[in-house]
Amino acid sequence: MPHRASPDLRFAVSRRQILVGAAAALGSGALAYPLRAAPLETKPRKQLLVFLLSGGASQLETWDPKPGTATGGPFRAIPTSLPGVHISELLPHTAKIMHRLAVVRSLDSKLAGHEPATYAMQAGRIVPGYPELGSAVAKLLERPEDVLPGHVVIHRTGTKGYTDLGGAGFLGAKYEPIRLIGNEPPKNLLRLPTVSETQSALIDRVRRSTDERYRQRRELGPSAAYATTYDQAKALMERREIFDLTKESTADVERYGKHEFGQNCLLARRLLMAGITSVKVTHFDWDSHQHNFHWQKVRCAEFDRTFATFIEDLAERGMLEHTHVLVTSEMGRTPQIDNLGGRGHWGKAWSVVMAGSGVKPGMVYGSTTDDGMEVKDDKISLGDLFHTNLSALGIDSSASYAIAGQTNPVADPAAKPVDALLA
């Protein structure tokens, strides 16, 4: 039975509230120096990139097609750069880079509701209060010299859907993701026009002095979390050039796509280059209860080229070998096609994709039955997947967090890494 988090952590403040509040006291303009990659090191730090296809992408129209069957639908399966492996014809660009990917076709998450499935997919278990993968990685891979936030999530404008159902859990405010809406910088990063530079500096000094006196009297997690998050807000402000996509070449903008998902992925690449440990990009509207084949075609058309471009870009820049990539939804879709041409929610047998750091490229793990209703070989759970993602980043997934004298397992002790997927 998992241990409960320290009671002190129940006071963890909202990271977004801190950022907005702190930003009003910070003063700086956009800096003139160009975007720079993280400092070169003998051994590049591991990073995480997650694509969350929110709503439930259909495994039958993406990674595990069943053409010519009663459940397969109208689309063909096409050959890929991996001999003998076929994926849906809706992913022609991805088919050309399959030799870089590892496809898992045997995930059984057992959950088929948006809210619980989104949380469990990201946390690797159904028990509430645990950190999502990105927050866990930000904690477990952090370095003393880190000044930027460890985990950033990029949503589309207009809605975050169910993707807000992750978070840092008992790790507290310091590891909450910075949530961006579109490819714009966080709101209120600039000093307010009514606050002078002198006033801003004074506010900063008072804040630091007050915080230090408070911490000397009473050591509490929220105080340290506030101070750290304030400093990270300031560091983000000083790196506003990260968000300036006008620095990207016309060719790159075209390759990634001028749609919002393409531009968000360009920003994700820039965040990784700047040294952010974990970046998650969300892609919406995969929930196809009606007209499934139309909507999956529309969503795949936008995702396919951008995703394939991003992976090739990481490889060409030498970043893929130290960046672990996960492509997932919160669940799959039913093999049965209903009378409205839709597919419902399905957690029993569906697919995810991995690439990059720690993963054996060019492989398919597991299989489903001919009708896609059940896992046939090598079933894995969400807990196993969480262990595997951590292990691919060189993290001991059997370890525990030590917080305020209590321990919490990093990953579900009842699960384990899938060694066959690990390089």
Which residues does each predicted region cover?
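Ligand-binding pockets and gating/stacking loops
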Residues: 1-423
